[in-house]
Amino acid sequence: MSTLTFLLMDAPYEQARTSTAFRLIDSALRRKVGVRVFAYEGAVSLAMTGQKPHANAVHGRTLEEEAHPTPHAWVAALGAMAQENGVPFDWVNCGLCVDERGANEVVPCTRRGSPADFWKMNIESANTLVIPTR
């Protein structure tokens, strides 16, 4: 089975690069391709369960009307999709980055690791896509 590795660096809500990465990961999982993600720097916050949706007072929308997405829900949905499709999904948060940001409360389909995990993921994958910050 083919496996792809993604290295993400952007924090939630900062750049369109993150949502693009989620779309690529979603597409791979739908095609039953295994996915490994190494979250580095601000990207470790993508899986934080403390994120909450909010209303949009500027546009006069309630919480329900705004339907604000939370990245941790996307990460959990990707993990669930992989499980449903019977393909590997390994989301690793850089432990040093987690400690720097206090990003300890995360969705269950993720784990703590180190840059050595990214190295191993890279070697074992058909291809690796690094989505850097600017």
Named regions from a protein language model:
Residues 4-19, 35, 41, 46-47:
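Short, glycine-rich nucleotide/cofactor-binding loops
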Residues 53-57, 109-111:
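Short, hinge-like loop/turn segments at secondary-structure boundaries
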Residues 21-30:
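Walker A/P-loop phosphate-binding motif and the immediately C-terminal alpha-helix
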Residues 3, 30-36, 90:
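Residues at the starts of beta-strands that form the adenosine-phosphate
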Residues 89-134:
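N-terminal glycine-rich phosphate/adenylate-binding segment common to multiple enzyme folds
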Residues 55-93:
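A glycine-rich helix N-cap at a beta->alpha junction
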Residues 29-30, 83-85, 122-123:
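Anion (oxyanion) recognition and catalysis
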Residues 45-55:
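RNase H catalytic domain
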